[in-house]
Amino acid sequence: ALTLKRKIDASNKERTDMVEYIDSYFLQKYSGVAVKDSAKINSESPAWAIDRLSILALKIYHMNEEATRAEASQEHRDNCQAKLNVLLEQRTDLSTAIDDLLQDIENGDKFMKVYKQMKMYNDDELNPVLYQNKK
């Protein structure tokens, strides 16, 4: 179980590193924008929103598989289709929100910061379970 957890942690770190890399790209791209005095920060960076969009794409794929699975009952397929419809609406809304955020940043109406994630659970020096096991 610990080996699997470490693999999941490593995969999550790769994903987090990629999100931070994408945010660094956006930060560089919009570095010359004159930020308005009234500009506000968004609660989520563009790359973290894109990360959510990628997770949503996986949910849509798998829900569509269930909604069209021939051997499933009609009730199951109908329930999954209803869920799929919600996921598709979420994708539309999130895509629009990302487009709006990037436009707002480009116009100086919003600004962004890149925060490095500080995960403690996978750090031998910060996680009590890990540093106690080293003794």
Residue ranges and their predicted role:
Residues A1-K135:
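Anionic, Ser/Thr-rich low-complexity intrinsically disordered regions
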